[in-house]
């Protein structure tokens, strides 16, 4: 079995660093690179691409809303076509920078509020996925299982890779618990290890209310801004290796 381990990276800008990207890049198999709106800038994007190339890590675009102060986690009521252009602008920027460094963008992962907005609107999801397919039909789209984005990506002929968020709680319906609610963030090392082990062994996760739910995913995400994210990523990687699974970038094992 192949498993991808990924993290959102390059989300600082200028002299500001959100996490130790250099250390994280030595642990993950895929990097979701911020594209300049919620985080990142041209120099940071180029640095992330070079780090990924040096470490044999696959790269993906991680576009968000133009809201640095809110880190792209606040919804802004843009028109659908405006959102489409914002997404394409960011994707195109990373593709150009990657190409100049001899790398290809292999996957795509929405950031926070932009993804939430797309995921609850099937018309918007189709608009976005069709645009991505026109730019590069080989891109792999990170999705939540049974989501609008997953369905739209498949309608557009794009490959998908389902995500398990190791540091976020799920409800009994398989939805992420809103960040503002108690228990939404899972940062305890023992809890993360147990969650990942259950996922790798049984394809399941324990929801916040204790319900055991199916988690049909092949990629594990740890957020770089989660407290202790580096150690959590090391724990997750060790569990993947101990399970006998092969660590592989997203583009190598999408459905």
UniProtKB/Swiss-Prot annotation:
Keyword Nucleotide-binding tagged: yes
GO molecular function, one term: 5-oxoprolinase (ATP-hydrolyzing) activity
NCBIfam families on file: PRK05406.1-3, PRK05406.1-5
Keywords for the protein's UniProt record, in alphabetical order: ATP-binding, Hydrolase, Nucleotide-binding
Self-association and partners: Forms a complex composed of PxpA, PxpB and PxpC.
Similarity field: Belongs to the LamB/PxpA family.
Its EC number(s): 3.5.2.9
GO terms of biological process kind: carbohydrate metabolic process
Annotated InterPro entries: Glyco_hydro/deAcase_b/a-brl (IPR011330), LamB/YcsF/PxpA-like (IPR005501)
A Pfam match: LamB_YcsF
Name of this protein: 5-oxoprolinase subunit A 2
Substrates-to-products reaction catalysed: 5-oxo-L-proline + ATP + 2 H2O = L-glutamate + ADP + phosphate + H(+)
Its biological purpose: Catalyzes the cleavage of 5-oxoproline to form L-glutamate coupled to the hydrolysis of ATP to ADP and inorganic phosphate.
SUPFAM superfamilies, per database record: Glycoside hydrolase/deacetylase (SSF88713)
């Amino acid at each position: 079995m192949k498993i991808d381990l990924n993290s959102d990276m390059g989300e600082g800008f200028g002299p500001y660093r959100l996490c130790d990207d250099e250390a994280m890049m030595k642990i993950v198999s895929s990097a979701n690179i911020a594209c300049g709106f919620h985080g990142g800038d041209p120099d940071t994007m180029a640095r992330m691409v070079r780090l990924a190339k040096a470490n044999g890590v696959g790269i993906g675009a991680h576009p968000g809303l133009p809201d640095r102060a809110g880190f792209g986690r606040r919804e802004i009521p843009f028109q659908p076509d405006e959102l489409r252009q914002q997404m394409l602008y960011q994707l195109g920027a990373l593709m150009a920078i990657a190409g100049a460094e001899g790398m290809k963008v292999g996957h795509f992962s929405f950031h926070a509020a932009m993804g939430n907005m797309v995921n609850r609107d099937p018309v918007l999801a189709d608009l976005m996925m069709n645009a991505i397919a026109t730019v590069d039909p080989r891109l792999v789209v990170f999705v939540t299982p049974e989501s609008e984005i997953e369905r739209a990506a498949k309608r557009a002929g794009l490959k998908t890779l389902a995500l398990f968020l190791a540091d976020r709680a799920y409800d009994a319906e398989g939805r992420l618990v809103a960040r503002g609610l108690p228990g939404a963030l899972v940062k305890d090392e023992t809890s993360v290890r147990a969650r990942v082990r259950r996922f790798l062994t049984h394809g399941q996760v324990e929801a916040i209310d204790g319900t055991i739910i199916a988690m049909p995913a092949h990629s594990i995400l740890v957020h770089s801004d989660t407290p202790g994210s580096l150690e959590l990523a090391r724990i997750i990687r060790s569990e993947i290796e101990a399970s006998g699974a092969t660590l592989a970038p997203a583009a190598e094992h999408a459905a």
